[in-house]
Swiss-Prot record:
UniProt record similarity statement: Belongs to the IF-3 family.
Free-text function comment from the UniProt entry: IF-3 binds to the 30S ribosomal subunit and shifts the equilibrium between 70S ribosomes and their 50S and 30S subunits in favor of the free subunits, thus enhancing the availability of 30S subunits on which protein synthesis initiation begins.
Location(s), subcellular: Cytoplasm
HAMAP family: IF_3
Protein's name in the database: Translation initiation factor IF-3
Disulphide bond pairs: none
A GO MF term: translation initiation factor activity
PANTHER family in alphabetical order: TRANSLATION INITIATION FACTOR IF-3, TRANSLATION INITIATION FACTOR IF-3, MITOCHONDRIAL
Membrane-spanning residues: none
One annotated Gene Ontology cellular component of this protein: membrane
Assigned keywords, A-Z: Cytoplasm, Initiation factor, Protein biosynthesis
Protein encoded by which gene: infC
GO biological process, one term: ribosome disassembly
Organism whose genome encodes this protein: Methylobacterium sp. (strain 4-46)
């Protein structure tokens, strides 16, 4: 049964099948090509670890550094990258065909805020009862939303009827 693979670069005696390495010291200076065991001895004398940085080059590039600190810094960088990464959410705005002007303006301000936050917006227009006979009013309303947001958003999904509601999805530019 093969030994389990560790994630991250190989260090010290985990580096196998290598006769010579290109050594970079702790200050970043190139120490040249030397035998693997000589490089390992230099690392032990300096109280540091020999870490394989570029395993695919010939000869492999190894660097003298504190492996524990190196792993810690790598984990911190990954955590910071995850923190900075924003997941795009789909926010929903619900409208009715007979919406008043003020209510419409309030909804449009919310749409604008969602785009500033980088979220997509799903505009849902719900028809009730006999409003289904006047789908053209609903389509005009969604076209108006599209026209007012064309500067800051692009249409990801054109208005389409699904059951008793018409749906359009907008994404920020």
């Amino acid at each position: 049964m093969p030994a389990p693979q560790k994630d991250g670069p190989r260090a010290n005696r985990d580096i196998r099948g290598v006769r010579e390495v290109q050594l970079i010291d702790e200050t970043g200076q190139n120490r040249g090509v030397m035998g693997f065991f000589d490089a390992l001895q230099v690392a032990e004398e300096a109280g540091l670890d020999l870490v394989e940085i570029a395993p695919n080059s010939t000869p492999p590039v190894c660097k003298l550094l504190d492996y524990g600190r190196y792993r810690f810094n790598e984990q911190k960088k990954q955590a910071e990258a995850r923190k900075r990464q924003k997941t795009v959410e789909v926010k929903e705005i619900k409208l009715r065909p007979g919406i008043d002007k003020h209510d419409y303006d309030v909804k449009m301000k919310a749409v604008q805020r969602f785009f500033e936050e980088g979220d997509k917006v799903k505009v849902t227009l719900r028809f009730r009862g006999r409003e289904m006979a006047h789908q053209d009013l609903g389509l005009r309303l969604l076209e108006r939303v599209k026209a007012e947001t064309q500067e800051i958003a692009k249409v990801e999904s054109e208005p389409q009827l699904e059951g008793r509601q018409m749906i359009m999805i907008l994404a920020p530019r």
